[in-house]
């Protein structure tokens, strides 16, 4: 994060180590996944693509095209400034999921399983289709599901059961 607490580092480096030390959890990637919806879906894919050896990931109604999200006023009342500062274009950076996915594949890095789900009435639906098509064209191990529904918790809870 540009400002505030560094939640990404906490999730990326500290939380899994802590949990594996206090609970009988597997350290294997195939036994661990991280899931989130909306910006949390973005974060789950970013964590998995930044640390492909650690997690599989599920993204429910996720912000998969961070540039679209920054350039359009798609979510009233939400400010990405604490996360990205004054950035208006994150293409080709470690914040861009398209870039991270392609970089990993180009480098021959073994990627985790990715699960992507979205409602067909979600305002992020077209972006999710764009990411799905991009990932599948790169032969990424991506499973995509869609269901009728909007960008709300009712759909998120329904889709979470399938993860």
Go through each PLM region and give its residues.
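Non-catalytic cap/lid and distal C-terminal segments of serine-dependent acyl enzymes
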Residues: 1-163
């Amino acid at each position: 994060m540009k400002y505030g607490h560094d939640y990404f580092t906490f999730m990326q480096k500290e939380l899994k180590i802590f949990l594996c030390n206090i609970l009988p959890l597997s350290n294997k990637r195939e036994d661990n996944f991280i899931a989130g919806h909306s910006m949390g879906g973005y974060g789950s894919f970013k964590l998995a693509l930044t640390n492909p050896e650690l997690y599989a990931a599920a993204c429910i109604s996720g912000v998969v095209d961070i540039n679209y999200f920054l350039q359009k006023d798609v979510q009233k009342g939400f400010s990405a400034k604490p996360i990205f500062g004054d950035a208006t274009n994150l293409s080709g950076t470690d914040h861009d999921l398209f870039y991270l996915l392609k970089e990993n594949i180009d480098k021959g890095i073994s990627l985790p399983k990715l699960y992507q789900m979205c409602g067909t009435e979600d305002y992020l639906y077209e972006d999710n289709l764009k990411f799905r098509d991009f990932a599948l064209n790169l032969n990424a191990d991506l499973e995509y599901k869609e269901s009728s529904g909007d960008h709300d918790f009712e759909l998120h809870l329904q889709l979470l059961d399938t993860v």
